[in-house]
Amino acid sequence: GLVGTLLGHIGKAILS
């Protein structure tokens, strides 16, 4: 869903 994608992008940014 939209929220899942948003969290995925945020998590990826933190992980980078």
Swiss-Prot record:
- Tell me yes or no: is Signal among this UniProt entry's keywords: no
**Cystine connections:** none
UniProtKB keywords: Amidation, Amphibian defense peptide, Antibiotic, Antimicrobial, Immunity, Innate immunity
Say yes or no: keyword ATP-binding present: no
What is one GO biological process annotated to this record? innate immune response
Residues spanning the signal sequence: none
Which segments of the protein form a coiled coil according to its record?
none
Q: Which residues carry this modification: Serine amide?
A: S16
What is the documented function of this protein?
Antimicrobial peptide with potent activity against Gram-negative bacteria. In vitro, is cytotoxic to non-small cell lung adenocarcinoma A549 cells. Also, stimulates production of some pro-inflammatory cytokines (IL-1beta, and IL-23, but not TNF-alpha) by mouse peritoneal macrophages and down-regulates production of the anti-inflammatory cytokine IL-10 by lipopolysaccharide (LPS)-stimulated cells. Very weakly stimulates insulin release. Has a very weak activity in hemolysis.
Family, similarity comment: Belongs to the frog skin active peptide (FSAP) family. Frenatin subfamily.
What is the name attached to this protein's record? Frenatin 2.2S
